[in-house]
């Protein structure tokens, strides 16, 4: 069969499985690919369980994560699905954003109900901004008593409500193992789950539809033409002759106009999210702009020095610190393209943070950085990554 080309016609949605270890996340991922392959063979290839379980290593912000990516299609949508086998891999993925999720399937074994990691994953999903969660009650073939299933469902709904997720989210009874074995009744339930995913996870807002932002990677002067700032457009679209602001690092913002856009030495009328471009900016000297600033649509992004974040601290084995850190820890915070020193305040009741822990922290930076809630950062000491995190709240 010819390899199907990537169709742009369908909405593309990133999802993942979350939940307690051994509740069947990876089995469910394999079952979804098999059932969709059997139902729509022209749209899907099947992925074997052992391929998904041997999750390849990836690096995100200097942290190694084991994570599997599979893709599949329903009639309505194209999905990229991430599954991380180990609990630590989940936490690292959610905090570093190696694989962003537009929505998640929370897998809860009907035999156990919500467990500590179930709660932790839902809490993290809230903190890192996963927009929507629905539920697969797995191993439902092993519970004969409907009352037990109803109790588990109630517990899961309470857990979602406690973290401000939709407590009326779909809860679908499944047996991933039975569906993998081809049992028709349980196969039908997987299709029901995917119909719920199609319906309940909202279409994501694509990066091109957001306001323009480009981190500055380099600045140089072209004789006779002026100053060019280069970088990869993070979001939005920029057109020639549009006004922009350059913000961050310095006390004041700089207003200017983009008079030219270049990509691969060709002149363009516009650039969009994902493009590596050079922007020719009017009336700006080379020394007015530096790496670490961002070029933005006027009024859309502001620089800040104080924020709260959720961070994962590398273990010694991962190349992180060998010792814990305490209040007033002063590492560098690497945002987009540059390091800025910051002072860490730990939450009340937390005396120290050990390598391998994840923690909340308040940070005060010595220079302002253009940021929004949800921005990712690395924590570094002398250029070596010792942690990664995400801004959960801006304080100043």
Curated annotation (Swiss-Prot):
Amino acids binding Mg(2+): 26
Positions contributing to GTP binding: 19-26, 83-87, 138-141
InterPro entries: EF-Tu_GTP-bd (IPR041709), EF-Tu_GTPase (IPR050055), EFTu-like_2 (IPR004161), EFTU_2 (IPR033720), G_TR_CS (IPR031157), P-loop_NTPase (IPR027417), Small_GTP-bd (IPR005225), T_Tr_GTP-bd_dom (IPR000795)
Location of the region described as G2 in the Swiss-Prot/TrEMBL record: 62-66
Enzyme class, UniProt record, top EC level: hydrolase
Keyword tags: Cytoplasm, Elongation factor, GTP-binding, Hydrolase, Magnesium, Metal-binding, Nucleotide-binding, Protein biosynthesis
Family annotation (SUPFAM superfamilies): EF-Tu/eEF-1alpha/eIF2-gamma C-terminal domain, P-loop containing nucleoside triphosphate hydrolases, Translation proteins
G5 as annotated region, ranges: 175-177
Region of interest (G4), residue spans: 138-141
Organism domain of life: Bacteria
GO molecular function: GTP binding; GTPase activity; translation elongation factor activity
Cell compartment(s), UniProt: Cytoplasm
Catalytic activity: GTP + H2O = GDP + phosphate + H(+)
Pfam families per record: GTP_EFTU, GTP_EFTU_D2, GTP_EFTU_D3
Gene Ontology cellular component annotations, sorted alphabetically: cytosol
Positions of region (G3): 83-86
Region of interest (G1), ranges: 19-26
Quaternary structure and partners: Monomer.
Function: GTP hydrolase that promotes the GTP-dependent binding of aminoacyl-tRNA to the A-site of ribosomes during protein biosynthesis.
Name the record gives this protein: Elongation factor Tu
């Amino acid at each position: 069969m010819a390899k199907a080309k990537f169709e742009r016609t369908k909405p593309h949605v990133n999802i993942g499985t979350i939940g307690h270890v051994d509740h069947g996340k990876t089995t469910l991922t394999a079952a979804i690919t098999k059932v969709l392959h059997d139902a729509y063979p022209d749209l899907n290839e099947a992925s074997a369980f052992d391929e998904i379980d041997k999750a390849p290593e990836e690096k995100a912000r200097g942290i190694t994560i084991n994570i599997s990516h599979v893709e599949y299609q329903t009639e309505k949508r194209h999905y990229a699905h991430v599954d991380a086998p180990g609990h630590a891999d989940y936490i690292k993925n959610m905090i570093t954003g190696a694989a962003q999720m537009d929505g998640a399937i929370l897998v809860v074994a009907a035999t156990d109900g919500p467990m500590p990691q179930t709660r932790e994953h839902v809490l993290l999903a809230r903190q890192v901004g996963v927009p929507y969660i629905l539920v697969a009650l797995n191993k439902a073939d092993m519970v004969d008593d409907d009352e037990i299933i109803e109790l588990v469902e109630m517990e899961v709904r309470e857990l979602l409500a406690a973290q401000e997720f939709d407590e009326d989210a779909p809860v679908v009874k499944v047996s991933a193992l039975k569906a993998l074995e081809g049992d028709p009744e349980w196969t039908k339930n997987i299709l029901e789950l995917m119909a719920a995913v199609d319906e309940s996870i909202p279409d994501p807002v694509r990066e091109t539809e957001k306001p323009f932002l480009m981190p500055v990677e380099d600045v140089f002067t072209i004789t006779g033409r002026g100053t060019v700032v280069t970088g990869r457009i993070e979001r939005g679209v920029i057109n020639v002759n549009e006004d922009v602001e350059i913000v961050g690092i310095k006390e004041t913002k700089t207003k200017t106009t983009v008079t030219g856009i270049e990509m691969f030495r060709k002149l363009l009328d516009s650039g969009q999210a994902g493009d590596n471009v050079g922007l020719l900016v009017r009336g700006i000297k080379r020394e007015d702009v530096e790496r670490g600033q961002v070029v933005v649509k006027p009024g859309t992004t502001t620089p800040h020095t104080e924020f709260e974040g959720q961070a994962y601290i590398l273990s010694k084995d991962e190349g992180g610190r060998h010792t814990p850190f305490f209040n007033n820890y002063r590492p560098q915070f690497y945002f987009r393209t540059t390091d800025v020193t910051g002072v860490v305040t730990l939450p009340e009741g937390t005396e120290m943070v050990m390598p391998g822990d994840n923690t909340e922290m308040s940070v005060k930076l010595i220079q302002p950085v253009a940021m929004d809630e949800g921005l990712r950062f690395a924590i570094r000491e002398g250029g070596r990554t010792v942690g990664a995190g995400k801004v959960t709240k801006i304080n100043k």
